């Protein structure tokens, strides 16, 4: 699997999600399962995606006391997901314990990444929760904390990719939502970029939802994006 595209499955019903999944090629993308779908459909839905040969990014953004998060991450590893995430704002100890609990899994451990600043958040949003910093400043602070904890990478907006690549190195994975091909609606994302521009900036993986899932021909859109990013 070499594709850099992660298709975000944001559906209310299993049948609708699987109808989309059955139209696309697992060699051309991975799939992201978030809070809504996982809460509704649970681990059996993830298993169905695995049976269709898709790698799964379990996007539950864990944020709790260290022991609780570590155990949740272990459960994700037992499920066999490819990637799982947590909130870097949970702190260094929380992230370190989550990383440590994956050690027995060796090469079969999922990638463990941290969410820095949600791509819907702007300066005012941060100020309202007591953070007197720009999104960029907060992303850098949390990315460095994530790297110190030994995690594999972070979720960040495309605009932060270049500086994170320069400061965190080539091996640190950068996963970027807020990806919108030219001509598509921005939706509720505020810090966005096209797939080609994001890859050029240094993104490792692009999270793309509605431009693919709501397309008349999802398979063709997916193929086209893969071609555009090489």
UniProtKB/Swiss-Prot annotation:
Entry annotated with the keyword Glycoprotein: no
Provenance organism: Haemophilus influenzae (strain 86-028NP)
Binding site for substrate: 10, 32, 59-68, 119, 180, 189, 209-210
Primary role: Catalyzes the decarboxylation of orotidine 5'-monophosphate (OMP) to uridine 5'-monophosphate (UMP).
A single GO BP: 'de novo' pyrimidine nucleobase biosynthetic process
SUPFAM superfamilies: Ribulose-phoshate binding barrel
Phylogenetic classification of the source organism: Bacteria, Pseudomonadati, Pseudomonadota, Gammaproteobacteria, Pasteurellales
Leader peptide range in chain numbering: none
Entry keywords, A to Z: Decarboxylase, Lyase, Pyrimidine biosynthesis
Keyword Lyase: yes
Annotated GO MF terms: orotidine-5'-phosphate decarboxylase activity
Pathway entry: Pyrimidine metabolism; UMP biosynthesis via de novo pathway; UMP from orotate: step 2/2
Transmembrane segment boundaries: none
Active site: 61 (proton donor)
Catalytic activity: orotidine 5'-phosphate + H(+) = UMP + CO2
Designated name of the protein: Orotidine 5'-phosphate decarboxylase
EC number: 4.1.1.23
Disulfide bond annotation, renumbered to this chain: none
Family in the record: Belongs to the OMP decarboxylase family. Type 1 subfamily.
């Amino acid at each position: 699997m070499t594709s850099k595209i992660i298709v975000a499955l944001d559906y209310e019903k299993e049948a609708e999600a699987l109808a989309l999944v059955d139209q696309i090629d697992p060699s051309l993308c991975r799939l992201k399962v978030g809070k809504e779908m996982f809460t509704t459909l649970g681990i059996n839905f993830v298993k169905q995606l695995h049976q269709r040969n898709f790698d799964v990014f379990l996007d539950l953004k864990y944020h709790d006391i260290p022991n609780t998060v570590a155990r949740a991450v272990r459960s994700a590893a037992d499920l066999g997901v490819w990637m799982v995430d947590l909130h870097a704002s949970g702190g260094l100890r929380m992230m370190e314990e989550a990383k440590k609990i994956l050690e027995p899994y060796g090469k079969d451990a999922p990638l463990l990444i941290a969410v820095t600043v949600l791509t819907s958040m702007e300066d005012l949003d941060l100020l309202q929760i007591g953070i007197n910093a720009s999104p960029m400043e907060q992303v850098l602070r949390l990315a460095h904390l994530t790297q110190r904890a030994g995690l594999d990478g972070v979720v960040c907006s495309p605009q932060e990719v270049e500086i994170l690549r320069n400061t965190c190195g080539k091996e640190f994975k950068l996963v970027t939502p807020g990806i919108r091909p030219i001509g598509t609606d921005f939706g509720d994302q505020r810090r966005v970029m096209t797939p080609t521009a994001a890859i050029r900036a240094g993104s490792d993986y692009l999270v793309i939802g509605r431009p693919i899932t709501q397309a008349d021909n999802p398979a063709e859109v997916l193929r086209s994006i893969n071609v555009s990013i090489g």
